[in-house]
Amino acid sequence: MLSPSENTALLVMDVQPAALDRISDKDAYLTRVRATVEAARRKAVPIRFVVVGFRPGMPEVSPRNQVFGAYRKQASTMLVDPRPAITPEDGDVVVTKRRVSAFTGSDLEVVLRGGDVQHLVLCGIATSGVVLSTVREAADKDYRLTVLSDLCADPDPEVHRVLLEKVFVRQAAVIASEQWVQSLG
């Protein structure tokens, strides 16, 4: 059996200014995410920031896309600057995606396979968006999965609860970030 940090990567997904504006108590959320990222770095767990981003004018987005199409209509610059809210450090990798799942429209899988990653530890905004889509796709790709319950956030508290308590547990270990950090030793 793998140790908690062996062949593991921490995916910090869509923790960007535009996404943070959609959740309550974003300062406390960011504090928890930063603490977990720092603990992972101390234990040499690779950090992979996944951000959503597009070229100016958003040519990657079809007018039929219900998630991102509204931003395109508004000629939004919000998603054209895909900086994570937590500053990456040397050794961290920032992956830009162009759809909801962290895998779709990105080179995430190439980056993970290049590092022989077999276990993904997931957190991000929104639970009903990037976290749900990534859990499903990663499970189909046979990754071992852990979802950090207190580092997932969603504008809809009931959807968040149902996903964590009833949906994700079918394909992932769902634990608090503190428990995962303690498991690193």
Name each region found by the language model:
Residues 17-21:
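Short acidic, Gly/Ser-rich segments with clustered Asp/Glu that frequently serve as metal-coordination loops
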Residues 15, 49-52, 149:
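A cross-domain feature marking catalytic cores of carbohydrate-active enzymes
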Residues 40-59:
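Von Willebrand factor
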Residues 9-16:
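Acidic-leg catalytic submotif of subtilisin-like serine proteases
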Residues 26-34:
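Short amphipathic alpha-helical segment that frequently serves as the phosphate-/nucleotide-binding helix
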Residues 59-71:
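Aromatic- and acidic-residue-enriched segments that line the glycan-binding/catalytic groove
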Residues 22-26, 159:
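Short, solvent-exposed loop/turn segments at secondary-structure boundaries
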Residues 1-7, 35-43, 68-185:
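Active-site-adjacent betaalpha module
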